Amino acid sequence: MIIKKLIPKSLKKIYHFTFAKLAAFVYGYPSRELTVVGITGTGGKSSVVYLLARLLESAGWLVGATSTVFFKIGDWEKLNNKKMTMLGRFQTQKMLRQMVRAGCKVAIIETTSQGIEQYRHLDIDYNTVVLTNLYPEHIEAHGGFANYKKAKGKLFATRPKTIIVNGDDANAEYFLNFSAKNKIKFCITDLQDLKLDWQGIHFFWNNTRFDLPLLGKFNAYNALCALTIAKSLGLSVEEIKKAAPVMQNIPGRLEFIDNGQQFKIIVDYAYEPKAMVGLYETIKMIPHQKVIHVLGATGGGRDRARRPILGQIVGEQANYAIITDEDPYDEDPREIINQVAEGALKVGKKECENFWKILDRREAIAKAISLAQKDDLILITGKGAEQAICVANEKKIPWDDRRVVRELLKNMSEEKSKYPVGSFVDLFTSEKGVRRARAHCVLQADGSVACTGDADILAALERGVSVLIDGEPHYYQPQDGIKFLLAVSAHFSNPYLFASEIQKL
């Protein structure tokens, strides 16, 4: 890394090329002993890698895979904790050699445009290369869409045996013009009688019915892509049908987190505008009340232009938006948050009313949970199953949105257990440190809270005034005071009680 930083920009390509050649030589060109499938595109790459790996494995193949989501070598696998989609040259070649030693038949490699530009694909003997789709993204890194498309094209120029392309994509013909023995197009019309609903995607493919627990049209494309690749590798439709039930539960992709709470929580990787729009199209099929969305944007100079666009999309679609830190790298995370917030403000969101800026991502998620009521839907986007937050000086902070959500839900459940039916607290509103109104609240058997005392406190609570909670145990909750108290009844049907419902004790 130190050597790389010292190399002049004009010599960087030579550096990357030389080390790519050296890495393949050191590890003995392992890809020559594998059937290598390279998956590239703007969206869906990781999902296709995951679905294909599961499908082939279920069909009895030993599989290796590398992607944003996970690494897999035969029976061994783990989530990707490197914060890199395509590993460096030596790491990639080493992993390919390990796949050979493990007896893997196929290696599936998520291959990025930036990885291609740095020659990480060099001397990998791709048997099959696949394009999921292509649309404007990572433009700042490549200096324009034309350069971005050209970078993707370099993978197809490796003269693979088979090229597989999304035929519905506007750029399909560009990639189909590259040389290959077999050229295959897949189109959404290949899925006959396609139906999308809350339970998944349902269709006929090659006169065979499939019912997959994957949500959304984009996952119909991802599944179709994986099925098409599997068939091109030699699996029969009957073998694919038998193996297909494993095509589900992609980590950090529309992943539901369920701890028994009465509202839904989805963690998703969507980090750019098109994916965000697709996510909102998909959740229309999910029964829900209000939408509470936690999001951020990536730093490090990555596509700054999309930041206010993300804020605008969420500002228009969500009832509540909470903008937080994501991966700031060397940028000021507050400035990134402000740029995203511009979009939300533009479409009428009002700070501290239906939109918040919270720097700490854990606090932002906790805020979303505190806002959620029965049948609401919380979206947490931008990181998916990523295992770290990237900050300044190339440091990585261990992180997993899903783990944090589970911890917060567990804490909420533990707080609930501290308040048996009949327990009470005294509430005091606090504005600028001055105690004002007071109420006495008792938890009822049905999960509601009965309050008596100064009714002004209830109006104050609705305004979001801080609350001092006295009783057993003692707590101070600086935000959403009554929410903290009512976490005990969050699983019941009537957790909220305001002025019109005051009961005399």
Regions found by a protein language model. Give the residues of each.
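Short, charged beta-turn/beta-strand-edge "cap" motif at the junction between a beta-strand
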Residues: 472-477
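Beta-strand/loop nucleic-acid-binding surfaces
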Residues: 447-458
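Structural detector for short beta-strands of small beta-barrel domains
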Residues: 418-439
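Short nucleic-acid-contacting surface segments enriched for D/E, G, S/T with interspersed K/R
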Residues: 456-468
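Phosphate-binding loop of NTP-binding sites
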Residues: 2-167, 172-180, 224, 230-233, ...
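ATP-dependent carboxylate-amine ligase
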Residues: 2, 6-13, 225-238, 242-252, ...
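Acidic, Mg2+-coordinating active-site environments of NTP-dependent enzymes
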Residues: 32-34, 102, 126-265, 288, ...
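OB-fold/S1-family single-stranded nucleic acid-binding modules
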Residues: 478-504
